[in-house]
């Protein structure tokens, strides 16, 4: 049977039979992969904890008719252990991998941008940014905005998303997909602080330096807007979102 190698982030695992697991991964070159890790639930398994969710791994797989089979695996970055030790980090990581699973709906369809965003977000979540550590809420919201943007759902945070009138604008409509002018605002449109919109723009482009001195009230307000935006633009929503301590 043909084999291949790839690097991947482990998204989730499911029990299979008495000793095996099906491992879902987002890979660098092959998109989303589902593969069987045989004997992984035995104490003598050669895989150990290397295929735990959130880990970044290098692996060799054997192509199968329905599911591939994991032949070898090396853990490049064991993100799982530190993220599981802190509830806020763990729940943020859970939302990230669930979002990645939704945004790459088809197996074996290359999604290099989504892979890079997820791997980078998990690294920042566990190790901090080049400008120092950031709260998990901030890292998660940046990932959600950027991954949705890579899938074609980028929010417009400058000009009116409906008519194109140049900003700045006070209204933000999650359903329309961004800021709206006073003439285009649907009933009940929230009016976040202008610093919150500027903060979201920084998250969207990954400008961590610009987030250094953001007030916590702006972070919390931004998280609410991102959560509403995600619920509108992901068809099934994210089941892990209610676990977040927002």
From Swiss-Prot:
UniProt cross-references to InterPro entries, sorted A to Z: ARFGAP/RecO (IPR037278), DNA_rep/recomb_RecO_N (IPR022572), NA-bd_OB-fold (IPR012340), RecO (IPR003717), RecO_C (IPR042242)
Sorted alphabetically, the Gene Ontology cellular component annotations on this record are:
bacterial nucleoid
For this protein, the record's SUPFAM superfamilies field holds:
ArfGap/RecO-like zinc finger (SSF57863), Nucleic acid-binding proteins (SSF50249)
DNA damage recorded as keyword:
yes
GO terms of biological process kind = DNA recombination; double-strand break repair
Q: Which residues cross the membrane?
A: none
Q: Which keywords does this chain's UniProt record carry? A: DNA damage, DNA recombination, DNA repair
Regarding protein family, the annotation reads: Belongs to the RecO family.
Function comment: Involved in DNA repair and RecF pathway recombination.
Which NCBIfam families does the UniProt entry name for this protein?
reco
Q: Which HAMAP family match?
A: RecO (MF_00201)
The record's section on PANTHER family has: DNA REPAIR PROTEIN RECO (PTHR33991:SF1)
The protein here is known as DNA repair protein RecO
Q: Which gene encodes it?
A: recO
């Amino acid at each position: 049977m043909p084999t291949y190698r790839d690097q991947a982030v482990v998204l989730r695992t499911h029990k299979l039979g008495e000793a095996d697991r099906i491992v879902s991964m987002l890979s660098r070159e092959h998109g989303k992969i589902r593969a069987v890790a045989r004997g992984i639930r035995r104490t003598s398994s050669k895989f150990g904890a290397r295929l735990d969710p959130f880990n970044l791994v290098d692996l060799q797989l054997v192509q199968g008719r329905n599911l591939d089979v994991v032949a070898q695996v090396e853990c490049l970055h064991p993100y799982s252990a530190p993220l599981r030790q802190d509830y806020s980090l763990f729940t943020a990581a859970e939302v990230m991998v669930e979002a990645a699973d939704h945004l790459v709906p088809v197996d074996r369809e290359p999604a290099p941008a989504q892979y890079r965003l997820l791997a980078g977000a998990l690294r920042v979540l566990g190790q901090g940014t080049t400008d120092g550590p950031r709260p998990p809420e901030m890292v998660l919201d940046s990932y959600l905005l950027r991954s949705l943007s890579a899938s074609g759902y980028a929010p417009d945070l400058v000009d009116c998303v409906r008519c194109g009138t140049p900003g700045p604008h006070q209204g933000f409509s999650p359903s329309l997909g961004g800021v709206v002018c006073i003439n285009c605002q649907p009933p009940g449109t929230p009016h976040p602080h202008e610093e919150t919109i500027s903060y979201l723009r920084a998250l969207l482009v990954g400008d961590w330096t610009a987030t250094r001195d953001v007030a916590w009230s702006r972070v919390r307000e931004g998280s609410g807007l991102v959560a509403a935006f995600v619920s509108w633009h992901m068809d099934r929503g994210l089941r892990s979102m209610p676990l977040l301590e927002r």
